Regions:
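Flexible, acidic glycine-rich loops studded with aromatic residues
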Residues: 60-65, 70-212
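Active-site neighborhood of glycoside hydrolase catalytic domains
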Residues: 1-66, 72-77
Length: 212
């Protein structure tokens, strides 16, 4: 099995001129304790850095180049750069609610990146075959969410982590949280009109809506 996998890795590394290769390691039972370390070493010998899921294979600093955190159990480790994907699976989202939480969320509950916090990735993990590919972009609100997480990752900060009450805007329209999202919403709608015209951009203004 390892011999065949190495042949596949040869083909992948020859085909894709990229600096990183993600090798997975989540949701599987390992019977050979040398399997993952040998695969990591093999990919590194190809001149590429290796990413692995967490939870997944248990690494120490220096044994892997980067970890991608998934599920609530994903934890960053000192000495290993981490990508936060834990609450960023868009197919789990509510279209008009969770973009607020995404915009307000502190990535890995930190103010800014560091040597141990490399950034964030959003994912669309649809489990069903969809007739039209663009439906995934539309139904998962991809472009608005992309702009929300891009701004948060570029600017840092945020008010809380995604798993708290951030899907609801404050009632007080003068609060900093409300005004910040209102400002972002205005700029996002400008992008919708000017740069995403003709693309499936599933968002309309909502900060003016009052709920009783």
């Amino acid at each position: 099995g390892m011999k065949i996998l190495k042949l596949l890795l040869d083909e992948i590394c020859e085909t894709f001129d990229v600096p990183y290769l993600h090798i997975g390691t989540d949701e599987v039972h390992f019977t050979n304790p040398q399997f993952v370390p040998e695969m990591v070493a093999y990919v590194r010998d190809k001149g590429k850095k290796v990413i692995s899921w967490n939870p997944g294979w248990k690494y120490k600093a220096g044994e892997i180049d980067m970890m991608q955190l998934w599920s609530y159990r994903g934890k960053a480790q000192q000495g290993i750069p981490a990508i936060d994907s834990r609450f960023h699976y868009l197919n789990h989202f509510d279209t008009f609610g969770d973009i607020i939480a995404l915009y307000n969320s502190r990535i890995y509950n930190a103010d800014m990146g560091s040597d141990d916090l490399a950034g964030v990735i959003m994912g669309i993990w649809n489990d069903r075959l969809i007739d039209k590919e663009w439906n995934m972009v539309l139904e998962n609100n991809f472009y608005p969410n992309m702009l929300a997480i891009a701004e948060r990752s570029w600017r840092g900060g945020g008010t809380e982590y995604f798993d708290k009450q951030g899907t609801i805007l404050p009632v007080d329209e003068n609060s900093e949280v409300f005004r910040n999202f209102e400002d972002f919403e205005s700029r996002m709608l400008w992008y919708k009109e000017h740069l995403f015209k003709g693309y499936p951009f599933a968002y309309v203004k909502q900060t003016h809506v009052k709920w009783n």
